[in-house]
Amino acid sequence: MQLWLLLAIGLLSADTALERGQEAFRRRDFTTAEKEFLQAIREEPSNARAHKFLGMVYTAEERFQRAEEPFRQACAIDPKEENACYYLGRVYYTLNRYEDSLAAFDKALQNASEKGRTFYGMALTLEAMGRDAEAEQDFKESIRAGEKSALQAYGMFLFRHGRTEESLAALRNAGAKEELERVTNSLGKSPGTKARREPQPLRFESRPLDMIVNNGATGRKYLVETMIAGIAIFDYDNDGWPDIFIANGASLPGLEKTDAGFSNRLFHNNRDGTFEDVTAKAGIAGRGYSMGVAAADYDNDGWVDLFVTGVRSNALYRNRGDGTFEDVTARAGVGGDGSWAVAAAWLDYDNDGWLDLFVVRYLVWDPAHELNCGVQRPGMRGYCHPQHFQPLPNALYHNQRNGTFRDVSIESGIAQYRGKGMGVAIGDYDLDGRMDIFVANDTVPNFLFHNEGSGKFREVGVPAWIAYNGDARALSSMGADFRDYDNDGREDIFVTALSNETFPLFRNLPEGGFIDLSIPSRIAAGSVPWSGWSTGIFDFNNDGLKDIFTANGNVIDNAEMISSRKSRQPNTVFTNRGDGTFRMETLPGAAFHRGAAFGDLDRDGRIDVAVTRLNENPVVLRNITDQSGHWIQLRLVGTKSNRDGIGAWIHIVTESGDQWNRVTTSVGYGSSSDRVVHFGLGNESVIKTISIDWPSGIRQRLENVQADRFLTIEER
C-alpha cells in the first residue's frame, strides 16, 4: 500500500455504507470497501468523502488509473476535503501526468494542514519535469512545514544532482542511515559533476528489408501476436560484413509456420547497402512461433551459431561454415520444456572457455485457453494483462564441450525464482570477474542474478536496488542493456517499459548497488509517451559518450480508442550530454517497433540499427550522422577464452579520458547485436592504451593505436 495512505487508515470506525466501507478498508478488505463506497456514492453523489475513499481503495490495489476519477470528483466537490486534492496530485504523479499533478497540488494548498506533504509532492513532480530550482525550493518549503520524509528525499535529490556534501548533511539530519551509507560510499563519484556539451544531432537513413514480419493476427488478440519479433546482427559467413537474421511468427492458434510468409529470414550483406534473402539456401526457415534470437559461436569452431526462442519450442542452429545451418536442437538438449521463451543470451558463466546459454521465459500460456480480455469498452477485445497468467522460471544450460548442454537451472539457483521475463542483459556489475545476469520482468520485480562462482547464482535484485524503479514500483519492463554509459568503469543498466511508466536508468554505484537516475537524467520526462521494447547503449555520433536507442510501439493496436497515446510510435535516441543528462531525439517513421540490434553494417565507423516492425518490413537505419568523431572497432578472438571473446572487459585511454565496454551479443528485447566492440573517440586520433581483461584471466595491453580502423585482437 502507498505510504501516503497509511495516515488515513487509523481514522476509520459502522453503520452507513460510508462507515461500513471505512471499516472494511481498515481491515484491508478492499473488495467489500469498494462495494460499500460505490453504494455510498449512489446514495449521495455529492459526498466528497465517499469518492475520496473509493480512490483510496483503488490506490491501495495499485489501480492508479481507476483511482483518478474518484479523487478528481472528491477534489472538485470539496477541495477542502482532507487529502482529496493531495491524493489526486499523487495519482497524477504516479501516472506521470505532471502538469495535472501540479494543478491538483495547487488546489491541495488550500488546506493549511496539508502544506508539508503537498510541497513534497510538488517537489517530486517538478524534479521529474526538469524544473530543478523550483523543486529544490518546494523541498525546503516542505521541510519547513514539518514533513518528516521530505528531508531524506531532499538529501537524495541533492545526491542525484551531484551535490554530495550537501546531500550527506541532509541525510545525517534525517537519520537516514541506509541512504547515508550509499552516498558515503559514492563520495567523489556522484552523477552530474561534469560540464554539459550539446551532442551532435543524429541522422539515420531508413531502408526496408524484403520481408513482412507476420504475427499471424486473427482478431482474437492472442497474446503472442504483440510480442514478436527479435532480430540479430552477426557475420555468419566471416566475410567481415555483418548480416541480419529475423525471427518470425506463425499461424494461430496452431503455432505452425504454415506458409513461407511465416519463415524466419536470413539476409546476407551485399556490401553495397543492400541485403539478399538467403534463408532457403541456409536452411534456417525454422518452425513454430519464433520470438527472439541469440547469436554466438557456442562450439568454438570459428562460425557464429544461432539460438532461436519461441512458444512451446526453441531451436539451436549450428553454422556449418559453408553458408548453411544444421538444426541440432535435439542433440544439444536445449529444446526446452514447452514453455514460452522470449529471449536468450550467451555467456561463459564459469569461465571455462565455452559459452553457456541462458533462456528467458515469460509466462504460462496456451492458445487453446486464451482469455477474452476487454479494453475498458464493451464489445472490444484486447490483449490480456500479464496479471492473468502464472510466471515461469528461467533456464540455464551448461556447455558440455561436446556439442551438448546440461540443464543446470535447478542446481545453479536460477529456477528458484519465477518471473515474467522479457529481456536479458549480461555484465559484471561488481567487477569480480564473473558474469552476472539481469532479467527485465513484465509487471513483477526484475531479477539480478549475482554469479557466486562454483556454478551458483544468488538473486539480489532488491538489495541491489534494481528490482523496482526509483518510486519502488515494478514496471512493465521489456528490453535491457548492461553497459557503462558514464565512463566510470562500472556497468549500468537501462530498461524500457510501457507508456506512462518511464524508462529507468540504473547507475551502478561503487558499493555494488544501483540508483535510478531516470528523473535527473531527463530520460523520465522524455520517455513518458513511449512504450519501449528493444534498446541499446551505443555511441551513435562517435563523441566518446554512449547514447541510448529505444524501439517504440504500443503494446495494443487500438490505443487511440481508449487513451491519448498513439499505437504506432517513433523510435527515440537519448543522446548523452556528458553531464549525467540526455537529450531526446525522435526519429522519423512511426510503427509497432519491437526488436532492435546494433552493428556497423556498412563499415563506415558509425553504428547502424536494424529494427523489426509488426506486420511491416523490418528496416535498416543507416547512420549518416554528419561530422561524426573518430572511432575504433575491436574484434576479439579467444584462444584460451571462448572463441568470440564474449565477456572480455575492454578499457581504452585517450587524451580525453577513459572508456570501458564489454564483448556481448545480448541486447534489448529478444535481440542480438554484433560482437564487434565499438568506441567513439571524439577528436582523438590516437588511443594511448587498450587493455583487455579476458574471461580466462589473461590481461592484454596495446599502446599507441591509430583510430578509424577495424582491429582484430587474438588472445595471447
Where are these regions (language model features)?
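Beta-propeller blade termini
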Residues: 228-238, 268, 289-304, 318, ...
